[in-house]
Amino acid sequence: MTEPTQPNAAPQNAVELDDNQIIAERREKLRALREQGVAYPNDFRPTHHAADLQTEYADADKDALETKALHVALAGRMMLKRVMGKASFATVRDGSGQIQFFITPADVGEATYEAFKKWDLGDIVAAKGVLFRTNKGELSVRCTELRLLSKALRPLPDKFHGLADQEMRYRQRYVDLIVTDEARKTFVARTKAVSSIRKFMAEADFMEVETPMLHPIPGGAAAKPFVTHHNALDMQMFLRIAPELYLKRLVVGGFERVFEINRNFRNEGVSPRHNPEFTMMEFYAAYTDYKWLMDFTEQLIRQAAVDALGNAAITYQGRELDLSKPFHRLTITQAIQKYAPQYSDAQLADGAFLRTELKKFGVDATQPAFLNAGIGALQLALFEETAESQLWEPTFIIDYPIEVSPLARASDSVDGITERFELFITGREIANGFSELNDPEDQAARFKKQVDQKDAGDEEAMYYDADYIRALEYGMPPAGGCGIGIDRLVMLLTDSPSIRDVILFPHLRRED
């Protein structure tokens, strides 16, 4: 038995041909298949998966497999092919992994063997046969039946170079998943992380719910919404920027622990950390506060890492990070002074000094969001310039100013701040939570201030939501709520530098 000696060699000589010529040749092969009968059959049913066989029989030697004589049926995409006289090999990948097919005319018949020679990389093929181990130790299927299930008309990228164009990887994710192992691993890890979160929430007695994606009033976050029109109702609608106000309505209604994992939409810029459509998990729990939320969020993220990766100790962009260790907690001013110790307490309490300092960082203090900004908002802006990117280890930044936290409960002990936190890991915001404001009169007053800011030109300021105020007037129990960015969390867990790496089909400019 002769086996391939270069299992990773470039596919045939097709890479040297023009793609259009290759496609034309493959269309001609498809035309011939149509003339022979059903070109795309759908009557083959696999009995096994490649990864299961590789795992179960990893330690089985040739003799053991020969004695067992396990009959299998597998199907998948042909990734490698070697035609070598009277014996040929094909590496086939299914949804779980890959396995080698061993094909001879004596086993499958001369006609099938000759047909196989004309098949191309990327074709979906199927085989029945007996599991065995080759002389070189490769677990393989000795094919007794071999079929072509789906003809691939376009060639796969060169095995060695793959999809070198990063944008092409995002635009043609279906090809990226075929040829890039890391891409497949990333999205498997994403699914495991989300499943872990759902399990964690269920075990903590949270109920998963679904709230509207089309809102009559955008609310729950400071952001620019996408605007659309409902024809039948003849009314303007907004794609949701956050589910928060609807979830808290459910807390009013008596569902004391609720959560939702779904998409939010924000009509803003695109960056390695931002996509206009992104996935968030928000949860609300009656009779809790922001301190409870921090403990709970820390446990949730740690468990998601373990379930997705098998370990809470990870590596991100070449640096180690241990999510099993307790997360840090700092106030905004503590964080500034930790990473920019040149600032004194007196300077951080001086509005004029802060405005001058922010100008040095290129922050326009005359923009609407800063025109009437108090000390707290200015401190937050300085924090974003000096400390935020330095927060590599998991750190809760706590006690946010009330003027930038219109939905959070005010502190009982310190004027001007709220019981709010944001969680940063590797310099990125991962979560935002707070003790909920359940005083309807206070909430109404804060909404009015937001309206004033919007009238002054702040496009991200919130609208006044009269129905939400009405809901609060029925009485909402004290509660805590938190939002976790699923995409950013998955970036962290999969060592992905861009949010586009963890979204299957990220938004891109139109193709020319």
UniProtKB/Swiss-Prot annotation:
The gene is lysS. This is Lysine--tRNA ligase. Its cofactor is Mg(2+). It is an enzyme of class 6 (ligase). Its main location: cytoplasm. The keyword Protein biosynthesis applies. CDD domains: LysRS_core (cd00775), LysRS_N (cd04322). HAMAP family: Lys_tRNA_synth_class2 (MF_00252). Mg(2+) 1 binds at residues 422, 429.
